[in-house]
């Protein structure tokens, strides 16, 4: 066997074509390209949303944030703040966008306070639909909201009317994951009681939250057990902290109280690790549900109404359209020139 032949055959496995290597090709391409994910966090002020997000991704997304005083909250309106950070771990890049909603639920009158949030979600669908219909489809940035952590106060006896209204208004647009904040303010018994109450109310009100898919039959038993535990933990009761404290002779992230220490990453203390595991292991599924269900529903409605409407805050100028068309024209001209050069070479070799 020649050296060149050996490079393209596998003598150890006769009849092997190579299709089994296709997943590796997809993996390498995905790693080179990197991943995009958009997470929205919604909930009243003071529930530790920013702290939890910083704890989840070991980063500081809000270094310059100023917390408004009580007087400023009375007439405060909902703002939309999107922060993007590039995270790299073992050669894998993640472009994470966290959409925060300061002002939600703070004002005395909270009627329609969630409408700016719904407008933002719809606007990202509009952007994506517009980009899909454009010339430069290869380089579409996906800013659609793939998941929404909805923070529920631990101080009530279940869902507030605003919680119900918001989730029902958004559940056909975004994957909602309910989170009970500040779990360290509850005893274990109170925690379980509140979880059951929230789940019962979600079912009674017909609210559609994100349901983890069942593990496949060919998955290993550890993964099946992990999936079962994650499903049983919804809604997740969490504690966030960026402070390192000493517990049992080691440094851990947690909160120090006169009665003891609450460790953020201790599954016996709260569901922080389960929430992070759910997000990481089901990130692809969250994106697929967004694409195949929520976005397709939005797209179908838009097409029924006669195509994409105007996108808020996005001005497609004539100059931009001309630049796109000129770039496309240049690519076509270059392709034609290459084809002509190849034909000329073939013609010359034929004459010889």
Swiss-Prot record:
CDD domains: CDC_Septin
An example molecular function term from Gene Ontology annotations: GTPase activity
Biological process annotations from GO: cilium assembly; cytoskeleton-dependent cytokinesis; protein localization; smoothened signaling pathway
Stored InterPro entries: G_SEPTIN_dom (IPR030379), P-loop_NTPase (IPR027417), Septin (IPR016491), Septin2 (IPR008113)
Pfam annotation, one family: Septin
Subcellular location: Cytoplasm; Cytoplasm, Cytoskeleton; Cytoplasm, Cytoskeleton, Spindle; Cleavage furrow
Gene3D superfamilies tied to this protein: P-loop containing nucleotide triphosphate hydrolases
Sites where the protein binds GTP: 43-50, 77, 103, 182-190, 240, 255
Residues carrying the site annotation Important for dimerization: 155
Region (Important for dimerization) residue spans: 259-269
Record region (G4 motif): 181-184
Keywords: Cell cycle, Cell division, Cell membrane, Cell projection, Cytoplasm, Cytoskeleton, GTP-binding, Membrane, Mitosis, Nucleotide-binding
Stretches for region G1 motif: 43-50
Domain Septin-type G: 33-305
Region (G3 motif): 100-103
GO annotation, cellular component aspect: cell division site; ciliary membrane; cleavage furrow; cytoplasm; microtubule cytoskeleton; midbody; septin complex; septin ring
Top-rank lineage group of the source organism: Eukaryota
Assembly mode: Septins polymerize into heterooligomeric protein complexes that form filaments, and associate with cellular membranes, actin filaments and microtubules. GTPase activity is required for filament formation. Can form heterooligomers with other family members and form filaments. Interacts with wdpcp.
Stated role: Filament-forming cytoskeletal GTPase. Required for normal organization of the actin cytoskeleton. Plays a role in the biogenesis of polarized columnar-shaped epithelium. Required for the progression through mitosis through regulation of chromosome congression. During anaphase, may be required for chromosome segregation and spindle elongation. Probably plays a role in ciliogenesis and collective cell movements including convergent extension during gastrulation.
Classification via PANTHER family: SEPTIN
Name by which UniProt lists this protein: Septin-2B
């Amino acid at each position: 066997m020649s050296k060149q032949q050996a490079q393209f055959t596998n003598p150890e496995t006769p009849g092997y074509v190579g299709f089994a290597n296709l997943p590796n090709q997809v993996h390498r391409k995905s790693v080179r390209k990197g991943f995009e994910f958009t997470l929205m966090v919604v909930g009243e002020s003071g529930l530790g949303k920013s702290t939890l997000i910083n704890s989840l991704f070991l980063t500081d997304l809000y270094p310059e944030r100023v917390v408004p005083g009580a007087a400023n909250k009375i007439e405060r309106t909902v703002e939309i703040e999107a922060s993007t950070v590039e995270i790299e771990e073992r050669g894998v890049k993640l472009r994470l966008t966290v959409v925060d909603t300061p002002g939600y639920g703070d004002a005395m009158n909270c009627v329609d306070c969630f409408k700016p949030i719904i407008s933002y979600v719809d606007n990202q669908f509009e952007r994506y639909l517009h980009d899909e219909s454009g010339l430069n489809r290869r380089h579409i940035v996906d800013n659609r909201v793939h998941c929404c952590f909805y923070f529920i106060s631990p101080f009530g006896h279940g869902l507030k009317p605003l919680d119900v209204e918001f989730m029902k208004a958004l559940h056909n647009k975004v994957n909602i994951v309910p989170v009970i904040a500040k779990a360290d303010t509850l005893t274990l018994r109170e925690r379980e009681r509140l979880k059951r109450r929230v789940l019962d109310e979600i079912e009674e009100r017909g609210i559609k939250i994100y349901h983890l898919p069942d593990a496949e039959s060919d998955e290993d038993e550890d993964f099946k057990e992990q999936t079962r535990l994650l499903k049983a933990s919804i809604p997740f009761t969490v504690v966030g902290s960026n402070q390192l404290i000493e517990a049992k002779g080691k440094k851990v992230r947690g909160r120090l109280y006169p009665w003891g220490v609450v460790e953020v990453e201790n599954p016996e203390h709260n569901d922080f690790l389960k929430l992070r595991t759910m997000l990481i292991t089901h990130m692809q599924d969250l994106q697929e549900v967004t694409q195949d269900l929520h976005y397709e529903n939005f797209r179908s409605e838009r097409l029924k109404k006669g195509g994409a409407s105007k996108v808020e805050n996005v001005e497609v100028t004539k100059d931009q359209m001309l630049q796109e068309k000129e770039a496309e024209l240049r690519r076509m001209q270059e392709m034609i020139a290459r084809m002509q050069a190849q034909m000329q070479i073939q013609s010359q070799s034929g004459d010889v």
